[in-house]
Amino acid sequence: MSASAVNVTPGRNVVVVGTQWGDEGKGKIVDWLTDHAQGVVRFQGGHNAGHTLIIGGKKTILRLIPSGIMREGVACYIGNGVVLSPEALFKEIGELEEAGVNVRDRLFISEATTLILPYHIAIDQAREARKGAGKIGTTGRGIGPAYEDKVGRRALRVQDLFDAKTFADRLRENLDFHNFVLTQYLGGAAVDFQATLDTMLGYADRLKPMVADVSRRLYDANNAGQNLLFEGAQGTLLDIDHGTYPFVTSSNCVAGAASAGAGVGPQKLNYILGITKAYCTRVGSGPFPSELYDADNPQRQDQVGVTLANVGKEFGSVTGRPRRTGWLDAAALRRSIQINGVSGLCMTKLDVLDGLDEVKLCVGYKIDGKDADILPRGAADVARCEPVYETFAGWKESTVGIKTWEALPANAQAYLTRVQEVAGVPVDMVSTGPDRDETILLRHPFKV
C-alpha cells in the first residue's frame, strides 16, 4: 500500500433510521444528505416499503434501489441484508431509465443477497388469507417468507443464479417443502418447478454485471475517503426483535442492522440520524397508543386524526393503504433512541400541524394504573398503554418551505424544543415540505 493511501482520512458514515412504524420521510432526507455522500447503501428489507422523493416538483417512488440513484455520480449498493425480487428490481430500473437516470453503471448488488421467489409470494398471500381478521397486514410481496428461508438456511441467493444445476437442485428441494405447506396447510395451489426455474435463471445474465462483493467495496470506498450513507427501510417499532411483536416486519430495521446487512464494522458508523414525523402513523394491524384515526375502525375517527391523514397525504406509497394517524409519541421515541443510539433527530412533516388550535405530545403512559415513561416490549403490553399528554398552543402561520429556525412560528419552536428535551437528543434537522430544499439544518450529520 502506498504512503499516500495510508494517509487518506477515512470518510464519514451516517445511518438513517426510522424511529416510528415506518413512513417517516426517510427518502427525502437521504436524498438531501446525498449531497455530501459518494455512496448510498440499502441494508435490509425488500420492495415492501417505498421511499418517496419530490425533486423539482416531480414525484419518484423507490422501493429497492437506494435513493442516491437520483444523484448523478453517486454509487448505490444493495447489501446482503436485503431480500431481492429480481422482477421488482428490473421494473424499477426500467422506470428510472425511462426517466433518463443511469442505473446499471452505478448499482452494486451483494452476491449474498437473498432472492424472493414466486413461492414466497404465494405463501405470504395464502397465509394472510387464512388468518382473516387476525392477519398482520403484510404487503403480500414475499418478504417474510424469504427471510424465513434465510434463517432456515434454505434461501437461494443471488450468487446461486450463476450455477444453473445447483440452483435447479436446490429449487426442487425447496419446492418440495413449500408446495407441501401451500397445498396441505394453507389450501393454496402448488408453484410449478420448471416455470420458476426458467424465470429465475432468465435473470442471471441481466443481474451479473451488477453483482459485487459489496462489503469489500464499501470498506475500500470508505478508506479512500468516501462518505457513505446507510438507508434504512420501515422503522424501529417494526423491527423483528425490538418492535411491537408480532405486528412487525421480518427484518432488523435498527441502526445495528446497517453493520450486519452491509458487511461494515460497527465502529465505522459515525452518526445515527433518527427520522420522526411531527405526529405518528401506522399501517396495518398492531397497537398504537396515541392513535386518533383509523379508516377501518369506527371507534377511531377523531377529527384531528382525519386532518393529519388528509393534509399529510397518509397513504402507503407502495400499497396505497390509508395510514392510521395519531399524536407524536415521545415515550416510543425514547425507546427508539435507546435501541439505535441516535445521535440526532430529523423531524419531518412539521407543516402538517399548521393551523391546528392545539398540538399534543405523548410523554408517557399509564399501564394498569402505573406510570411508564418508555414504550414497553411486545404488542400485548403496548396495547394496555393509556397515553399521557402534554398540550401546546398551535400555530396559524404556515411553516411550508421555511429554511431557518428563526423563521419558525414561536409556538412551533416551543413544540420542537420540548420534543428535544423529552427525547434527550438534539433535533438536528426539520423538514417543512416534500421538496428536498424545504429543510432546516441545525447540525449537519456528516460534519458533527
From Swiss-Prot:
Pfam families: Adenylsucc_synt (PF00709). It catalyses: IMP + L-aspartate + GTP = N(6)-(1,2-dicarboxyethyl)-AMP + GDP + phosphate + 2 H(+). One of its GO terms (molecular function) is magnesium ion binding. GO terms for biological process: 'de novo' AMP biosynthetic process; IMP metabolic process. SMART domains: Adenylsucc_synt. Mg(2+) binds at residues 23, 50. Plays an important role in the de novo pathway of purine nucleotide biosynthesis. Catalyzes the first committed step in the biosynthesis of AMP from IMP. Pathway: Purine metabolism; AMP biosynthesis via de novo pathway; AMP from IMP: step 1/2. Homodimer. It comes from Burkholderia lata (strain ATCC 17760 / DSM 23089 / LMG 22485 / NCIMB 9086 / R18194 / 383). IMP binds at residues 23-26, 48-51, 139, 153, 234, 249, 321. Belongs to the adenylosuccinate synthetase family. Substrate binds at residues 317-323. This is Adenylosuccinate synthetase 1. The active site is at residues 23, 51. The gene is purA1. The lineage of its organism: Bacteria, Pseudomonadati, Pseudomonadota, Betaproteobacteria, Burkholderiales.
